[in-house]
């Protein structure tokens, strides 16, 4: 009974003070009350981080809080470079498998090879290490050496490699290549500090090789720095063209224009987008569509039209707060509605509604209708960029079984073991990627090994869509093998493009004499209807 009255007394005291305490003081009193009275000991950092997270949950979905460590990792990712040794790897059963070596990087100079197995890093065995833990051990300060214990197939003894870390450029361009004698292709994965320079070099190189038309792939590009999006728009639009404008808290508008220093202001341009194309990618796509500069191919983009500004906190953490909404040159808002619990699941909602597979299921109210600035074509705002040419989603490609293979890296070990046994013979038969991509067929037994590994992991192959899934698995394996056999480019994506519906549709448009120009042609004005005079009866 006594305990009840103590609790009640505390509650009554709190209620009596409610009107006297301002909200900020209330927060501090709550923190102190937890510190002084809660049964378990809790650190201040954990409590404050939880309080901040609670406040951020009351804002829009894109305002976020980053701890000091998270902020540092984000800055490194966006800067486009880090100090490391220049390798790609996978971790499988206590072994680190080197899958790719960056040309000219520290690992390449030290003689590390694709196919090597890393057993220990600085005398520490990698047993039990996760991908993230391996990455933390390999990355470090520029100029600081790292010692790797390596097992190489064909060698009786393990070897030690001492490699000096150097800055590695984490390229925002996944790959750039000539599809044929006149069509170039560039896949952009992120908008970072290095994106404009990378794009400049890629365009100059492709033009020197005969490029007259370009496919710019922004599929699954989640955005990045807005300044980089302006820079890429500058590559394709003349000087003083509006890229976008933003409207902030005070309702004032800021306008962002091109500078006129682009490498590809003429020539056919097609942009590939999908349901995961977001943010800075949508700014760029919207500008190119509004100025009738490019044909947009694919599916409606994600719909993120909010601009975040970082607000540093003294301990190194960062609040990334939405400070403005951005609009395309024609005045379209790209942001989809974010009130409600379905925001993060919006892509799945669109899939369930049939919107991703049937263009007739896509509906925009007339209030969201707009027109492009040159040809006066009809476009829509209010929830992403709608493409000029719709390409339905291959639902088998997003089947849960294939997703499990990717998420759990089930294909990686069979592919690596296959290369271990066949690397020399493959390189003897296929001297370069072009011949490999043209003639190589993945053997059926390798596909079956992956199917068996998936079954053992609890992901059996279902009968529905089986043939298509096996075809996609074979293509995925071919891409993996290509990326490990040949260095210097992202050959994985080049292999996958041979069966990408949006890519193939873009090629078809570019091969038609008026394919692109026809879609970008000005809308013909309909003559006014004239009344026919007749005799009154």
Indicate where each model-derived feature is located.
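Structured segments of extracytoplasmic/periplasmic soluble domains
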Residues: 33-37, 41, 50, 54-58, ...
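Cleft-lining beta-strand/loop regions that shape enzyme active-site pockets
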Residues: 18-23, 27, 31-44, 97-100, ...
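A sequence-level detector of short linear motifs
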Residues: 127, 160, 320, 335, ...
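Polar, glycine-rich mid-to-C-terminal structural blocks
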Residues: 280, 292, 299, 303-367
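Extended, small/polar residue-biased N-terminal targeting/export presequences
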Residues: 21, 38-99, 145-175, 496-507, ...
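Bacterial Sec-dependent N-terminal signal peptides
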Residues: 1-23
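Conserved functional hotspot residues or short segments at active or partner-binding sites
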Residues: 333-334, 338-537
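A short, compositionally biased
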Residues: 83, 141-147, 306, 320-322, ...
